[in-house]
Amino acid sequence: MSNKLKVASFFSGIGGIDLGFENAGMEVIFQCEILSFSQNVLKKHWPAIPLQTDITTLDAKDIPYADVYVGGFPCQDLSLANQGKRKGLEGARSGLFYKYAELIEQNRPRWVLIENVPGLLNSANGQDFRIVARTLDELGYCVAWRVLDGQFFGTPQRRRRAYIVASLGTCGAAEVLFEPLGDSVIDLQSRKPRNFIAREADESLPEAAFFSIQHAGINRKPSAGPQGKGYRNDGATYTLDSRGGADAVCSTNDTFGVRTTPGLSGRMDSNRYRALGNAVCVPVIEWIAKRILVADRKYYK
């Protein structure tokens, strides 16, 4: 029998959270996802794992024992992109949090992870987040939350998401999301200058075909050319646009097989784009999962 922590995944999407927990050394033993496109992705990558399709009809007794429940309930009613139309937890989609909480109450896993858009924190003037935190607290969980951004975890994107970790009967949740001061303070003199790293990186990069998309490009200087687009050392770099000409790597996987004109883009595979848009930043999830493992050994073993 495996000694790995077991994970039950809800609102699984295409399995980004599941992958992050597997990368950290845990075992996913259950998934629940309603969209058929995402179900097909899950079946391809986790063919042996039980997959339920509708959380609203899911009975707690049908979920195998799991140490960790993970899931990001639908964000449409919470997202700032729907400003003026946000129904919050009263909405039919984001209101599925209550069903998730019901399953947590009945099965009482040691750990709970909730991922959602930052809009969860201020929806209904903060009342929706208060409901989420209070609900978990009343179920006996210690609750911690933090907004994390994918750009600080080695990915070339700004993807800010709110993460809520809850630990049953212990204060372990806070230790998962927040580092002790000693772990977060570094000796600046020990760091290599970024321009040195940039020079040394060239030989390690793989060969690839490229073509021109912008003349100025991204220079190694803090500012370069009339657009002033140099590399930044305080966050994600500037985005190349389509004016002029410079270098872009040709990759079938990165471009979904074809580079198109704006007229064609509207006819692309919307299911794939929607699934990617709803996905999580896996390195962030893996970081959280690894810290759950450490805290679990401390508080539950």
For the regions a language model picked out, list residue spans one by one:
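Short glycine- and Lys/Arg-enriched binding-loop motifs that mark or flank ligand-binding interfaces
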Residues: 9-12, 67-68, 91, 115, ...
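Short coil/turn residues that cap or connect secondary-structure elements
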Residues: 121-124, 140, 280, 284
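Class I SAM-dependent DNA methyltransferase catalytic core
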Residues: 145-152, 157-301
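Basic/polar N-terminal segments that are highly enriched at the extreme N-terminus
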Residues: 1-3, 300-301
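Core alpha/beta nucleotide-donor-binding catalytic domains of modification enzymes
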Residues: 2-111, 117-130, 134-137
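Conserved hydrophobic/aromatic pocket- or pore-lining residues that grip, position, or stack substrates
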Residues: 13, 141, 240
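Charged, glycine-enriched surface loops/patches
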Residues: 125-149, 167-170
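Conserved S-adenosyl-L-methionine
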Residues: 52-54, 118, 140-152
